[in-house]
């Protein structure tokens, strides 16, 4: 009986992994990289025109790009080759703090919307190696799901300054949560916080997805979820976002 159970479990894992692989590679995983390196960066350097990006900062090492999904979603991406959360470059002190830069770029959402969008409605997210469709690092700048916003508001006083499991998880998946100040977020990359503070995370960064959300007390919550095929968790932190931005119509 036990052997049968183990066999079925193995089959489930294999099928789940195959499904993830198909989903990931069914398109062009280098599409974003080609846009950045072959269009946005050359156009900015040669013609001082960031198109098709919204902004190109060669010296700072990043671009901001309007994503085609959702009316207000933007992506922050490096101007050089970094695949994703698994890249050792993200743990180098000289690497830009991409999450902080993404937070500074949230104003593009308001500009597109035509009105100021409150910080509480904004979220940042990056997916894991198997939870993404593109192999160029990109942080999603978009609206937070209203139900996730409500849950994090309710958990405000229970979120520690250490990485601890978020009570109840999010979207049916387990998450770690850590509270940081604005100054901490500006000075230290969430990638480094995860790698240095969560046991064994440094050696398996590609398994993790990360998100950043502003709280009502002006602190930030860092959220991390680890890939777990047994629970069908591809570690896609983008799941906490709502690219249709329903939260704006409820305010």
From Swiss-Prot:
Which Pfam families is this protein grouped with? Answer: CDH (PF02611)
**Membrane-topology annotation of the record:** Single-pass membrane protein
Q: Which GO terms describe its molecular function?
A: CDP-diacylglycerol diphosphatase activity
Q: Which UniProt keywords apply?
A: Cell inner membrane, Cell membrane, Hydrolase, Lipid biosynthesis, Lipid metabolism, Membrane, Phospholipid biosynthesis, Phospholipid metabolism, Transmembrane, Transmembrane helix
Q: Which domain of life is it from?
A: Bacteria
Name the chemical reaction catalysed here.
a CDP-1,2-diacyl-sn-glycerol + H2O = a 1,2-diacyl-sn-glycero-3-phosphate + CMP + 2 H(+)
Provide the primary localization. Answer: membrane
Instruction: Quote the subcellular location field of this record.
Output: Cell inner membrane
What are its E.C. numbers?
3.6.1.26
What residue intervals traverse the membrane? 5-25
GO biological process terms, alphabetically, are: CDP-diacylglycerol catabolic process; phospholipid biosynthetic process
Q: In which pathway does it act?
A: Phospholipid metabolism; CDP-diacylglycerol degradation; phosphatidate from CDP-diacylglycerol: step 1/1
**InterPro entries found in the cross-reference section:** CDP-diacylglyc_Pase, CDP-diacylglyc_Pase_proteobac, HIT-like_sf
Q: Which GO terms describe its cellular component?
A: plasma membrane
NCBIfam families, per the entry? cdh, PRK05471.1-5, PRK05471.1-6
Family to which the UniProt record says this protein belongs: Belongs to the Cdh family.
Report what the protein is called: CDP-diacylglycerol pyrophosphatase
Species assigned in the record: Salmonella typhimurium (strain LT2 / SGSC1412 / ATCC 700720)
Lineage at the top is: Bacteria, Pseudomonadati, Pseudomonadota, Gammaproteobacteria, Enterobacterales
């Amino acid at each position: 009986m036990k052997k049968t159970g183990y066999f079925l479990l193995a089959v489930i894992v294999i099928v789940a992994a195959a499904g993830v692989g198909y989903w990931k590679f069914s398109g062009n995983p280098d599409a974003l990289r080609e846009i950045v390196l072959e269009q946005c960066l050359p156009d900015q350097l040669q013609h001082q025109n960031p198109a098709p990006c919204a902004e190109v900062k060669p010296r700072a090492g990043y671009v901001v790009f309007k994503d085609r999904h959702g009316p207000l979603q933007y992506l922050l991406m490096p101007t050089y080759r970094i695949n994703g959360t698994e890249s050792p470059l993200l743990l180098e002190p000289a690497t830009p703090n991409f999450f902080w830069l993404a937070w500074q770029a949230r104003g593009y959402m308001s500009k597109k919307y035509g009105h100021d969008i409150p910080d509480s409605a904004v979220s940042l997210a990056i997916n894991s190696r198997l939870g993404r469709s593109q192999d160029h690092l990109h942080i999603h700048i978009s609206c937070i799901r209203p139900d996730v916003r409500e849950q994090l508001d309710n958990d405000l006083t229970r979120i520690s300054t250490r990485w601890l499991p978020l009570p109840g998880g999010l979207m049916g998946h387990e998450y770690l949560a850590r509270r940081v100040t604005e100054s901490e977020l500006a000075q230290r990359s969430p990638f480094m916080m995860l790698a240095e503070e969560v046991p064994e995370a440094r050696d398996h960064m590609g398994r993790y997805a990360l998100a950043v959300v502003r709280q009502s007390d002006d602190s930030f919550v860092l959220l991390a979820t680890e890939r777990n095929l047994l629970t069908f968790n591809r570690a896609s932190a983008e799941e906490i976002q709502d690219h249709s931005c329903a939260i704006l119509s409820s305010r």
